[in-house]
Amino acid sequence: WSHMIPNNFFKQCGINPTAKIVNILKSKNISKPIIGFPFKAGSSLISYSYESNVDCLALDWTVDLNWAKKNINSLITIQGNLDPASLIPNKSVFLEKNVLSILDIMKDNKFIFNVGHGLTPDCKINNVKKVIDIVKNYK
């Protein structure tokens, strides 16, 4: 819950511990990509993307992807950031539009489509299937 760390302590309490863990894993020749998810870190995402040594930065649904494209380290992959609430039945009216918007914005970047903070118990499984179909058929 990165947003709970005051900005002046984010490097010390958020970035440095992550970088230490990532560096240890990489020194052990771990070949799998390492994903960091500094939930609601706001503008601290910029320094996190450059200093944490993660291979992929997962973004929650509050991050504007156009901002991310301009500010996040372009050498790492971005993952995210569909609002999980859009999978809830009464909030799914704009689901396809939201998914396509994310895909359109990120189409020329290293990107993994994902929900911006996991599925909630009240999400509709048909909406999850719909998202999968949209992503699979996106051109």
Per-region residue spans from a language model:
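Active-site loop segments of alpha/beta catalytic cores
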Residues: W1-K139
